[in-house]
Structure formats: C-alpha cells, structure tokens
Amino acid sequence: MATPSAAFEALMNGVTSWDVPEDAVPCELLLIGEASFPVMVNDMGQVLIATSSYGRGRLVVVSHEDYLVEAQLTPFLLNAVGWLCSSPGAPIGVHPSLAPLAKILEGSGVDAKVEPEVKDSLGVYCIDAYNETMTEKLVKFMKRGGGLLIGGQAWDWANQGEDERVLFTFPGNLVTSVAGIYFTDNKGDTSFFKVSKKMPKIPVLVSCEDDLSEDREELLHGISELDISNSDCFPSQLLVHGALAFPLGLDSYHGCVIAAARYGRGRVVVTGHKVLFTVGKLGPFLLNAVRWLDGGRRGKVVVQTELRTLSGLLAVGGIDTSIEPNLTSDASVYCFEPVSEVGVKELQEFVAEGGGLFVGAQAWWWAFKNPGVSPLARFPGNLLLNPFGISITSQSLNPGPFRTPKAGIRTYHFRSTLAEFQVIMGRKRGNVEKGWLAKLGPDGAAFLQIPAEEIPAYMSVHRLLRKLLSRYRLPVATRENPVINDCCRGAMLSLATGLAHSGSDLSLLVPEIEDMYSSPYLRPSESPITVEVNCTNPGTRYCWMSTGLYIPGRQIIEVSLPEAAASADLKIQIGCHTDDLTRASKLFRGPLVINRCCLDKPTKSITCLWGGLLYIIVPQNSKLGSVPVTVKGAVHAPYYKLGETTLEEWKRHIQENPGPWGELATDNIILTVPTANLRTLENPEPLLRLWDEVMQAVARLGAEPFPLRLPQRIVADVQISVGWMHAGYPIMCHLESVQELINEKLIRTKGLWGPVHELGRNQQRQEWEFPPHTTEATCNLWCVYVHETVLGIPRSRANIALWPPVREKRVRIYLSKGPNVKNWNAWTALETYLQLQEAFGWEPFIRLFTEYRNQTNLPTDNVDKMNLWVKMFSHQVQKNLAPFFEAWAWPIQKEVTTSLAYLPEWKENIMKLYLLTQMPH
C-alpha cells in the first residue's frame, strides 16, 4: 500500500485549481483512525475531500455528489479512479445516480460504464452516498481490494430526516466509516479553496458532541459514580484522544479510568485494568456497557477464558455469555485483555464492521518491565486501541470513586482542550476550564509518543504543535520564577518536551534554555568520546550505568556501540531527574526532563530538550561485560569512583569537565549533585568510605549480601514529586539536602536521618510490611541502626522524636485512647519494634529478615502477615511474645496464641509496666 504522502501526490498530480460548482454546498468530513487523510481542505480548515484504505482496497470520499459529475474537476477525478484501481485495466463501474461521471471518464479514455450493482470484476465503483441497499456489498468489495469513489453531503439529509445522529445513520457513513471517514451535518464553506502542495492538516476538532451524548447517557444510565475503592488494583490512566472517543470515569485531576468510542460501525469500551471486570460495585455499568456494545442486536457475547469472573457478573444481570479463548466469527461483543500483537487487524475490522469490543488492561507493569520503550508505541493493547482514539498509559490512578460526566457540563477531552489552547495561543486571550491546561501538557506529551510517521491523524498534531512553539518563546521555570502548571506556559513545557522526544529538531523551534539542567555555554566536544561501560547486571531489575558524560540541552547526539550489544536490550537515558511533576501546581523545572530510548541499532540518535547526564540502562541478568560506547555531541562531567579515580584525576575533572551535574560513586551508592557543590569537595575519598560503611550497615540489617549487587542512587533536584525526600530508584531529594550528602563532618556530627530513612524504605518488603501502619515506621529501624553502629550517635540524639520522654508520652497517649491498630502508625508503630530491639538486640531482626528472604508462599493480607511476624519473632527469641503484641492491639489469632503457649513468658515485657501505671480511660 502506498504511503499517504505518495497517495496525495498521485491524487493531486496536475490539479491546479478546485473549480467546484457554486450551487453545491458540501458538508464537512470527519476523519478518524490511522489510514484516512485529507485531500481538499477549505480556508476554514474543513475537510471536503478525503481518502483512506480498508482491507486491501482504497476509498476516496467527496463531500458533495455534484463534485463527481463536474467536468471542471476532470483532472482530479481521473487521478482518483487511477489511484483507486489496484488492478490496471480493470473496468470502472458507475452507479446510475452518477451516470454523467461515466461519460467524463470515457471521454478521457477510461473504460467506464454504468453498473447498477457493484461487481467483483470491477476495479473501481463510483456511487453517491445515499444508497441504502448495497452497504455490505460495498464494504466487502473494498475489503477484497476494490476501489470506491463515493460522494454526497449529509446536512440536507439530516434536515429532512428524524434521526439526528448523522454519523451513525447516514447511509454513506455505514460504508465510509469503516475506513475512518464520516459525512457530518456541518455545512462546508466554499468561499475559498487552495490547492495544497503538501498534504493538508486534519483539523484538531470537528464538532460532533451531539452524536455522542446519547451513547454516554446509555452507558451511564442509573450510574452516578464508578467506585473501585475496594478493587485492590491501580488502573492505568487512559488517554482519550479520538474525535469519537469520550471519557466515562474521571478523577479530580481529569485522569480517565474508563472510556468508550465509536469506530466505523462498531463500538469500544476500555477500562484501565482487567480487574475492573470483577468489581461488584461496577456491575450495573458492566451490564450497560455490554448492552451498548451489542447495539440492540441481542447477539453472542464472548468472554475471554481468563476473564470468566465477568461472565458471572453479567449472568446476574440476565446476559448470557460464551467463554472462549479467542474471538469467534459469530460474536457480537468480545470481552478480553490484549496481551499480544496477534490478531490486531482482525479485531480492528471486527469493530469497524459493527462489533463491540470490551477491553480491560493496564500498561504500567509492561512499562516497568520495558524501560525506555513507550507503551503508547509498543504495548500490545495500544497497537489495537490507538486507532480507536483511546490509549492506555503507564500512569496509574489511585483506586477510588471516579466521577461520571454530567449532561450539560463540559468534560475534559484532549482534542477540545488542544483546540482551545490553539485559539488562546493565537489570540493571547481565552478561558479554559480549571485543570484542563495542566492535563493537556502531559496528555500531549503522551500523545506525541504514538508513532506518527506517515500517519496523518498524528502528524497533523505534530505539525500544529511545531507551528505554535515556533511562534512563542518557551518559558524557563526556576525556583525564583516558577511557571504555573495550569496555564498555557505550563502546557508548553510538557508539549515541547514531548515534541523533542518524538524526534522534532527543537533547535529550530525554541530559544536556548538556561537553567540548572541546560546551559547555553556548554559546547559539545568536537570529536566523539568513547567510554567503557560495565554492562553486567547481576541484579533482579534493570540498572543505570553512569558514563561520566553530560548532554547539553537540545543537542542531538549519536550513540554507537558494537553489533552484539545492539541486540542485548540496552537502553540509553539522558537525565537522572526522573520525578514526574505534571501534577505540581507550580513548576521550578520542566515537568519531565529525561528521555529514554532503546539501543536496538549499532548507531542511534537521541535528544533531550533539557539535557542531562548520560546513562546506559542495563537489563537484569545481563552478562555483556565492558562495552565501548561512542558518543557524538557530549561533554565530560565530574565523576569520582572510589578505588578507581585518583585525587589528581578528581581535581582535573572538577577544573576541566564542564557538565553542570556530577557523580560520586562507590560499588554500593552513587550520589548525583550539582557540580557547583562538588567543587567544594577537595578529596571525596573519606566521604565515600563513610558512605560505604553506611551502606554495609544497611545491607547487614536487611540481610543483604555486601557489596551490593547493584548500587543505590541518590539524586538531588530543584523540585521533586512528593515530600522532602522519597525512596525509589533513584532516591530523590531537594538541593537543600546536598550538604547532608557530601559533607563528611556534618554527617558525623549531625547524622544522616533523611537519606537513611529512604534507604530503609527501599529495604522494606511486602512480606513483613503492614501498610499503611508501618510504611513510615520500619524504615526508621535502619536509621537507628546506622546512627548507632556507624556514626556513634545514640537514637535519642539522632532524632528528637526518639528522646525518651517523648517516646514514653507517645505510648501513654496511644494507650489512653484505647489501644487500636487503626491508630498504630509511624512513630507509634516504630516504638513496638524499638522495644523489641532494646530487649533482644539487632540479631533477631537480622535473622528474621534472612528467614523472610528464604521463604515462599507467604501471606499477603495484614492480619495474617502480622500473626506470622509474631510467631517468627517469638521463635527467634524463644519467648512467647503474643501478650506483648496484644498489648499493642495487634489482631492476634487464637491459634497463634495457642501455638506459642509452650514458649517461656517474656517477663521483662515493658508493656506490662505501661499498662499497670496507665490511668484508666
């Protein structure tokens, strides 16, 4: 099949003007999907002629039938039938309603004749858009490889009929919609036409809200909210970007959990997780959805074998289902989770020709397992869903009640908001609903991840955004001059980042940026830089490998590596500041300032608008060893590795390496801070030896081998997504914490509570964690252990919250209110563990954590996990600790109490003293 660009050139070859009949008022065409594109667009941006493909065939749609019998348009008509005919020499059939067209074609030497019916022997069939008897024949003709030239307008038809839903009832749309082209009841302006030298853009927005309102009402009948509070799942956020797609459940940030769409003659409903198919509270919605998808046919509902629970929920509502491993030929509705690329085309045709598809899937786990690969581009579910105008993102949503759109109240939609953004940017005035521009930025950045090459529906948005950003200076967000996220300037930051990541050369579009992440004074090395990167990863997850290189902002770099390494699932990453700030109210930096991509070729190009340190991401269990990586367009950054970098080399790095960020590394910890801070560090060795002692203590308490299989990372940033610091890979902290990381004297005197707290968070395991009670508690065991065993700082001085009078008061307050595990959180919960440690030492904890690591099939709910902890700790210390934990109001099961009765009583149980001296409540 020819590319859209080549097809447009063929259709417009020799066409120098659009001499359309003045008395023929056309209608605007709506284009959706990935195959359709405009050919003729008026001065108002309305599409009046469009083309597409379906199956093996092709389609040209003209927005008034009189255009097809206008002799002045002969050059275009000849091009059209020539392009449509995939079998050279095959005859052209013309429906009697367009008989003059046959004469026009014959007069130009084309074998054309009037045919009342479409036949397989024809190469092209020409017909008006009002025929109601040949719908299925025309679709099958096109699908088998025939070309279809069809013309008509729907505004007059709509005025004469009772059914106002033109998109779904107009006869022509029952044919052309399978290929993504719809006749609308919007009149087309004919005052000015321009013959385009290149393919025109598809409009961002074509008004069709009225056609979808009934669908929304039917889907949400009797439903005021979509409550998944107790579903125990985190659904993916859906990106609703199609003109005929619409959200059904939104959170307070306009994040969508369930959406629906029309596509061709069929319908689609998507949920952000397959678990939502099993949520009892969603039962009424699930019934509505299946009935809507069926479209009144009362046809066969097929449920994928893995989703058999849904079958039971539907049966309660009187809907019979058939449980099958795959889609069947007689299905009306198919409910399933897409897990592979197999059958995508068949499923899309199933919907286009009238089927209903009910999809449940999340993409965040796939994204975690495939770093550097966009789920919008490669996740199997999105290969299916992108053309429908709904995509599943890697962003998760919190489970909870989701509001449903209400009639008469505007609801956020990517396309309508983008259209308003375009107007505001052009006129410098306008008013968008609160929160919409804050949502537009990340949604636009996500949309731009969908592969757009030779797909006009996506390229049109790219072209629009490039045009907008080339006109207006990109704002610079700093702490001194923050950018409000929910405004055009905030949206521009996300959209510009998305454009850069999609491959646009932003050096032509945006001015040089000067902030913490990108300096206009950085000039890349004139010659390529080759570094040896250790690409062995014995860990159980991917890891970043530092290169000691920095990439200036807006710089397109070229990365080269050996052929063998190009097939080893390596990725490249520019930037280390991974926090997503798209939900921040104010921005001190761009909301997303890193870029990742696969190193799947020996030579690869990548850019990042903001610049950043360069990393190679190595997958788990990689055994590649040292790999030479050559980079064009980089500069050196300060880098010190304990045991490898000499003091003389470090001093030279600080003086000569211009990168604004640098790293201090051991085999167990890597600190990433601004170069300005590193210049105050004359000799990093004593500091890093202390950090290695800290990491050894962290590993010892957590029963981990040392040296660590992979080093932990701590990265300083001007703004982070949550809190003062937060755990993860990497641990993130504010710039104000840099001295706490790199000042050895300060660490030894004041301690290191914050960073070790986050290192402790990374040590927590779900097997012995009882969220939310211990989330901010057990991690502090590492703080106490490190401060006392490495830094020599007693717990009472390490944190004011552990001063003995404060601890005692906290316990008494807890008991005075009536001990209840609901109130057992944070410092109060930590006290339980500290009492055990002060009585039995650290060794029982270390042995216990070792035992947990070696066990399998452990419980997952809090009550069972807490009872297992009581049993295991009691066995470790050979004391019956059930009374101790009961005093703390743990839900100790009777069988556990009985099983521990043989152990000696713990007579020193400090909770006895508290209970004896506690005032009655």
Swiss-Prot record:
GO terms for molecular function: transmembrane transporter binding. GO terms for biological process: positive regulation of protein targeting to membrane. GO terms for cellular component: plasma membrane. Interacts with TRPM8 (via N-terminus and C-terminus domains); the interaction inhibits TRPM8 channel activity. Interacts with TRPV6. It comes from Pongo abelii. Positively regulates the plasma membrane cation channel TRPM8 activity. Involved in the recruitment of TRPM8 to the cell surface. Promotes prostate cancer cell migration inhibition in a TRPM8-dependent manner. The gene is TCAF1. Keywords: Cell membrane, Membrane, Transport. PANTHER family: EXPERIMENTAL AUTOIMMUNE PROSTATITIS ANTIGEN 2-RELATED, TRPM8 CHANNEL-ASSOCIATED FACTOR 1. InterPro entries: Class_I_gatase-like, M60-like_N, Pep_M60_3, Peptidase_M60_dom, TCAF. Residues 542-841 form the Peptidase M60 domain. It is found in: Cell membrane. This is TRPM8 channel-associated factor 1.
